[in-house]
Amino acid sequence: MGVEGCTKCIKYLLFVFNFVFWLAGGVILGVALWLRHDPQTTSLLYLELGNKPAPNTFYVGIYILIAVGAVMMFVGFLGCYGAIQESQCLLGTFFTCLVILFACEVAAGIWGFVNKDQIAKDVKQFYDQALQQAVMDDDANNAKAVVKTFHETLNCCGSNALTTLTTTILRNSLCPSGGNILTPLLQQDCHQKIDELFSGKLYLIGIAAIVVAVIMIFEMILSMVLCCGIRNSSVY
């Protein structure tokens, strides 16, 4: 015997929430793939300075997002199917998966908040090392290529006024061309541009995580209510 009355409304409401959850998983997967192949981050994080690669902390987070998006799509489908079939087993499995996902999201959120400045800090240190080598050593072609990629990708020059002045006088070719020698001095500080690059992307990820967390809370409540309704309807 199928559920009736308010429980039936909850059944279809849960289906709608799961469909939205499935779509959210697809959006997160798409955003993660976009961040993974974004020309700005890709051109910077694929660089190597000698035998030292660029920091990969950002990409570790992206790979986690890709996995989360794929799992969300699977769990959303499981919830939709369980709600339509009125299966306590599927709904129980769905609830368990949601609890695990929610716990992982909270843990990832805490880790992200604690390390939110570390990604940009690592990239800035990598840039500073390359800039120092490029300015001090005329034969450091690898370092020059790294610095030039940063400057052209972010449209910046130097990490502070002194470094920018030194770079302008000694290595003007490292900065984006602008027609005169003062142009690099007027361009934005590279540290600031690196902060803007990663803070904007982390802000986008944070908004997506909050929206998904709210949906998950509603889904856990609705799935338990529907499970109880299915159990009660089978008694009568």
Curated annotation (Swiss-Prot):
One of its GO terms (biological process) is positive regulation of CD4-positive, alpha-beta T cell proliferation. Disruption phenotype: Knockout mice exhibit reduced female fertitily and impaired egg-sperm fusion. In response to notexin-induced acute myoinjury, mutant mice display abnormal muscle regeneration characterized by typical giant distrophic myofibres. Mutant mice show reduced allergen-induced lung inflammation, eosinophilia and mucin production. These mice spontaneously develop multinucleated giant cells (MGCs) and show enhanced osteoclastogenesis when compared to wild-type littermates. CD81 and CD9 double knockout mice develop pulmonary emphysema, reminiscent of chronic obstructive pulmonary disease in human. Expressed in oocytes (at protein level). Highly expressed in granulosa cells. Expressed in skeletal muscle mainly in endothelial cells of endomysial capillaries, in satellite cells and myoblasts (at protein level). Expressed in hepatocytes (at protein level). It is found in: Cell membrane; Basolateral cell membrane. It is a multi-pass membrane protein. The chain crosses the membrane at residues 13-33, 64-84, 90-112, 202-224. Cholesterol binds at E219. One of its GO terms (cellular component) is basolateral plasma membrane. Disulfide bonds join C156-C190, C157-C175. Not glycosylated. Its main location: membrane. Structural component of specialized membrane microdomains known as tetraspanin-enriched microdomains (TERMs), which act as platforms for receptor clustering and signaling. Essential for trafficking and compartmentalization of CD19 receptor on the cell surface of activated B cells. Upon initial encounter with a microbial pathogen, enables the assembly of CD19-CR2 and B cell receptor complexes at signaling TERMs, lowering the threshold dose of antigen required to trigger B cell clonal expansion and humoral immune response. PANTHER family: CD81 ANTIGEN, TETRASPANIN. This is CD81 antigen. It comes from Mus musculus (Mouse).
